Curated annotation (Swiss-Prot):
One of its GO terms (biological process) is DNA-templated transcription elongation. Pfam families: GreA_GreB, GreA_GreB_N. InterPro entries: GreA/GreB_C_sf (IPR036953), TF_GreA/GreB_CS (IPR018151), Tscrpt_elong_fac_GreA (IPR006359), Tscrpt_elong_fac_GreA/B (IPR028624), Tscrpt_elong_fac_GreA/B_C (IPR001437), Tscrpt_elong_fac_GreA/B_fam (IPR023459), Tscrpt_elong_fac_GreA/B_N (IPR022691), Tscrpt_elong_fac_GreA/B_N_sf (IPR036805). This is Transcription elongation factor GreA. It comes from Rhodococcus erythropolis (strain PR4 / NBRC 100887). Keywords: Coiled coil, DNA-binding, Transcription, Transcription regulation. Gene3D superfamilies: Transcription elongation factor, GreA/GreB, C-terminal domain, Transcription elongation factor, GreA/GreB, N-terminal domain.
Length: 164
């Protein structure tokens, strides 16, 4: 049995994703009609339009399932308003293993939450690094597990609310 992970979203992101889901569901009959129209053109083996419409339908259905799962497991909250504490919705700056020159700035959120800001890396609060930093205060050092089984220390330099 798999455990459903809770995904944190702002109300704005939840509404945006719900709107996308509603549009995709409303578009189902359009794609079904396109498939039927292409099917009537004849030989399906060599019907590029038919295959393209079926592929589009598959991609759309996959996105619908992804959005339904995300929204069903979402915890809707407000973006953090305080600075200095790493919370979902915070842009954090950290350094690794005591090397203050090795810094990284990223958003603690879901990819969906940070999807509109291509310049900013996004780490999930459920990831090893994101989870280790949750509720850390500026100056706190935390340790997290790397994929190879070793651990790394990370120190929080700053945490600011994310504004999309």
């Amino acid at each position: 049995m798999t455990e459903t992970q809770v995904t944190w979203l702002t109300q704005e992101s939840h509404d945006r994703l719900k709107n996308e889901l509603d549009q995709l569901i409303a578009n189902r009959p359009v794609i079904a009609a396109e498939i039927n129209e292409r099917r009537e053109e004849g030989d399906l083996k060599e019907n590029g339009g038919y295959h393209a419409a079926r592929e589009e339908q598959g991609q759309q259905e996959a996105r619908i399932r992804q959005l339904q799962e995300l929204l069903n497991s979402a915890k809707v909250g407000e973006a953090p308003t305080q600075s200095g504490v790493a919370l979902p919705g915070s842009v954090v700056k950290v350094y690794y293993d005591g090397d203050e020159s090795d810094t990284e700035t990223f958003l603690i959120a879901t990819r969906e939450e940070g999807a509109r800001d291509a310049k900013l890396e996004v780490y999930s609060p459920n990831s090893p690094l994101g989870g280790a930093l949750l509720e850390a205060k500026v100056g706190d050092t935390r340790e997290y597990n790397l994929p190879n089984g070793s651990t790394m220390k990370v120190t929080l330099l700053s945490a600011e609310p994310y504004h999309s």
